[in-house]
């Protein structure tokens, strides 16, 4: 079974993805890390984030083992990832890697921004996780403070809105729900309630798959 989870920053999709992957025993790929690692490689080699050729080269050279996940979770790296993700050739360079991961025997779970629309358009289950701007900013601020970063809520909210605009308006694979995705609004849900809601969606898709019918 292939599960695609998409959504904007701090919507809760990453937490849901990890919980669901563990529950169903599926390998999990946070595809956002690919773009963060690409941006990190650019900066480490002294390139500007707007250097298209360097960004494309970094993406093509990336391997799934190139992740120092803790070092990629900062607010700065999130912003940098959004910049390089807007380069169509970078996205194209990373598509095959993501599809190979999704094609593993037994299935996989991928989360990102274009899994259900571009990477795995035929996924067995698609969930688009969203929440209000304010709820997402609150979550992101708490997350960053938990890592010891000094955070201003207003600045985090502004960053999220800018990133939403960039992600949804880019020419290549803009952020949007797949036509057959189930939208899950987590604004008023805690982690456990969101997980239970997502579990119902996935189990419904799984039951439909076993019955030989389209998931939705």
From Swiss-Prot:
Where in or outside the cell it occurs: the entry states: Cytoplasm
> Where on the tree of life does the source sit, at the highest rank?
Bacteria
Name the GO cellular-component terms. cytoplasm
- Tell me one GO biological process term: pyrimidine nucleotide metabolic process
Q: What is its EC number?
A: 2.7.4.25
> A Gene Ontology MF term for this entry?
CMP kinase activity
Q: Does the keyword Protein transport apply?
A: no
Q: What is this protein called?
A: Cytidylate kinase
